[in-house]
Amino acid sequence: MKKIQISPSILSADFSQLGNEIKRLEEGGADMIHVDVMDGHFVPNLTIGPPVIKALKKHCSIKFDVHLMIAPVHKYIEAYSDAGADIITIHPEATDDLENSILKIKSFNKKVGVSLNPESKIDLIKDYLEKIDLVLIMSVNPGFGGQKFMPEVLNKVKQLKEIQSRDNMNFDIEIDGGINFDNYQSAIEAGANILVSGLSLIHIS
């Protein structure tokens, strides 16, 4: 069984204190930091860009798990790679050529993640599972923090776990959205090994 990892999201953090927030999370035992990048187009919210990630990366050693909710995503991959992303996760709906975008991320020696929204089917990515490092299952509709967990997505997590076991694959299964002490165990039991949440969950791993 894979080690359970916690990737705290900075989406709800005090953006004027991001450096201190990340340092606090790192010292608290986080395995990585989840950075949500939104463009106001692919999702209805705006967050941070490459210069902020680059500045933050200078002051910490923890891995940055960067979730790109931007379209078209392909042309921004290099900028986020250069900024210091360790994992770059993209949505299949945000690129005209998912395989080419996966290869581009790999060309910068970054780990590749592909994200599925609550309504997105596994069929969208099943042909690429051998080529990626991580599948991110959204358990809320992307765009804003603080939404309620959608338990129906756990069926998708279970399906991915079955594919992983059947075909002897090694990708991580990450879940993001409304994860808390009431539901994290069900996410783990379904097959998730990376939980995106706040500081409160750090010590469960």
PLM regions with names:
Residues N141, K148-E189:
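Active-site/ligand-binding-proximal alpha/beta "capping" segment
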Residues I202-S205:
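Conserved small/polar residues in nucleotide/adenosyl-binding loops
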Residues F108:
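Residue microenvironments linked to proteolytic maturation
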